[in-house]
Amino acid sequence: MSFVGENSGVKMGSEDWEKDEPQCCLEDPAGSPLEPGPSLPTMNFVHTSPKVKNLNPKKFSIHDQDHKVLVLDSGNLIAVPDKNYIRPEIFFALASSLSSASAEKGSPILLGVSKGEFCLYCDKDKGQSHPSLQLKKEKLMKLAAQKESARRPFIFYRAQVGSWNMLESAAHPGWFICTSCNCNEPVGVTDKFENRKHIEFSFQPVCKAEMSPSEVSD
């Protein structure tokens, strides 16, 4: 999965989001690799109106069943072996309203990366018969305020299976975010449950994460 859209080489702002919040872990200000911490209780998302502006995104790293972690490398979201020197990508999850939401499928959420500057998106490219997973330059907090028709390709149902989570596209039911059994391959989507694809993930909360000031709504 790679960046799409105009100005894909966008540069991140130099300022960090300074919103006060409890610090239950330490971060190296120099940006040293993060070490995944122990599994914590799974977050509970609620159906929330997209007009709510004071809702803070949940922050976590994502790990698959093969002990791989998702990282962002040169605009590509890939799964690599979870080593101490690897810095996982920090995902920002925000509850999203959906008129046709099904409680059986899970909680609808939006997923952002790169400090909330890019969002995960599942849709079909022109001429393609199957959807693909992409990163689009959409600010997470602004996306949350858009109409449902514009948000739908960005919405994923988060279903909890014990301590694991599955992410199903709201725009393309039956298609789940997946990783390959091989290392260093792009994250994608699949509609097939097979041994060579992992669709269940562990979400490990991050206590404090950077986010561009422009992403914070008053």
From Swiss-Prot:
In general, low constitutive expression, if any, in healthy tissues; high expression in inflammatory counterparts, including in synovial tissues from individuals with active rheumatoid arthritis. Isoform A, isoform B and isoform C are expressed in testis, colon, placenta, lung and lymph node. Isoform D and isoform E were found only in testis and bone marrow. Whereas only isoform A is found in brain, only isoform B in kidney and only isoform C in heart. Gene3D superfamilies: 2.80.10.50. Residues 13-22 have a biased composition (Basic and acidic residues). Proteolytically converted to the mature form by CASP1. The keyword Cytoplasm applies. Keywords: Cytokine, Cytoplasm, Disease variant, Nucleus, Secreted. InterPro entries: IL-1_fam, IL-1RA/IL-36, IL1/FGF. One of its GO terms (cellular component) is extracellular space. Immune regulatory cytokine that acts as a suppressor of innate inflammatory and immune responses involved in curbing excessive inflammation. Signaling can occur via two mechanisms, intracellularly through nuclear translocation with SMAD3 and extracellularly after secretion and binding to its receptor composed of IL18R1 and IL18RAP. Suppresses, or reduces, pro-inflammatory cytokine production, including IL1A and IL6, as well as CCL12, CSF1, CSF2, CXCL13, IL1B, IL23A and IL1RN, but spares anti-inflammatory cytokines. Inhibits dendritic cell activation. Interacts with SMAD3. Binds IL18R1, but not to IL1R1, with lower affinity than IL18, and does not seem to act as a receptor antagonist for IL18. Interacts with cargo receptor TMED10; the interaction mediates the translocation from the cytoplasm into the ERGIC (endoplasmic reticulum-Golgi intermediate compartment) and thereby secretion. PANTHER family: INTERLEUKIN-1 FAMILY MEMBER (PTHR10078), INTERLEUKIN-37 (PTHR10078:SF31). This is Interleukin-37. It comes from Homo sapiens.
